[in-house]
């Protein structure tokens, strides 16, 4: 986002293109993450993205692809994410009878969850762009649909931040709750975490360093909380994954379940 922004004369000319390059690198990491999630889910007959996080991601991509992104490259990026989300969603639906046997209402309501996410993202975007200058700092040089004072970068930061929080915290919580690595892997964790760092935190950090008058939101206490929580969850995740893999059981069909009595019960059902 922010590809058409016009920074003040004292800002180095390379800052805005570099921030967009970081965003693109983060987007590619997430593309790889979605592909890995789909393959791992198919192989282990499970899912690797928490339902709430998946619903928020899809809804965020829909709203930005349809209503916010202006440049062809931006639209292509959001549409690519949406297309890559389809196999991840399919894998989640396939795994629902087994993974959500204890909560069938959750498994049957992914579409309403996406709809609510779309409504929330659309409402926030409508409020944010209702008047020029909304947000943190001086929005001179921030352009959207030919009008100055509308900061797509800040809008994307806040809305993506909520989605990132649900992904990072949700994936960690899911690992604790399920006690197995079905649907996930170290590679998925790495590309997901790198995508968060490069695509969400990196661009805004760079812009704040060189163009602080328009990007003060980066050091807002709420923003610091969101980033710190996401990074902490992502740093803890591989350590928890290592412990989980020591006790999990791989079944003959490739499925992975928690060790102990749960694994014995699952094996008994299969036989």
Where are these regions (language model features)?
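Alpha-helical membrane-protein topology signature
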Residues: 1-271
């Amino acid at each position: 986002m922010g590809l058409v922004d016009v920074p003040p004369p004292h800002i180095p000319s390379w800052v805005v293109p570099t921030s967009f390059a970081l965003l693109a690198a983060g987007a590619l990491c997430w593309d790889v993450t979605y592909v890995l999630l789909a393959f791992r889910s198919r192989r282990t007959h499970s899912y690797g993205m928490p339902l709430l996080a998946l619903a928020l991601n899809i809804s965020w991509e829909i709203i930005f692809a349809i209503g916010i992104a202006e440049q062809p490259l931006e639209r292509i990026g959001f549409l690519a994410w949406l297309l890559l989300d389809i196999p991840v969603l399919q894998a989640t639906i396939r795994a629902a009878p087994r993974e959500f046997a204890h909560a069938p209402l959750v498994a049957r309501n992914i579409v309403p969850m996406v709809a609510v996410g779309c409504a929330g993202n659309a409402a926030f975007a409508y409020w944010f762009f209702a008047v020029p200058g909304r947000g943190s700092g001086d929005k001179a040089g921030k352009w959207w649909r030919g009008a100055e004072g509308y900061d797509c970068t800040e809008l994307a930061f806040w809305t993506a931040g909520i989605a990132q929080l649900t992904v990072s915290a949700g994936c960690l919580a899911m690992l604790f709750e399920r006690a197995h690595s079905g649907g996930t892997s170290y590679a998925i964790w790495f590309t997901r975490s790198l995508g968060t760092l490069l695509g969400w935190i990196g661009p805004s950090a760079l812009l704040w360093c060189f163009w602080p008058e328009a990007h003060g939101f980066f050091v807002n206490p709420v923003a610091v909380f969101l980033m710190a929580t996401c990074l902490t969850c992502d740093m803890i995740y591989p350590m928890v994954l290592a412990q989980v893999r020591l006790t999990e059981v791989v079944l003959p069909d490739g499925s992975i379940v928690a060790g102990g009595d749960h694994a014995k019960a699952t094996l008994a059902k299969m036989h």
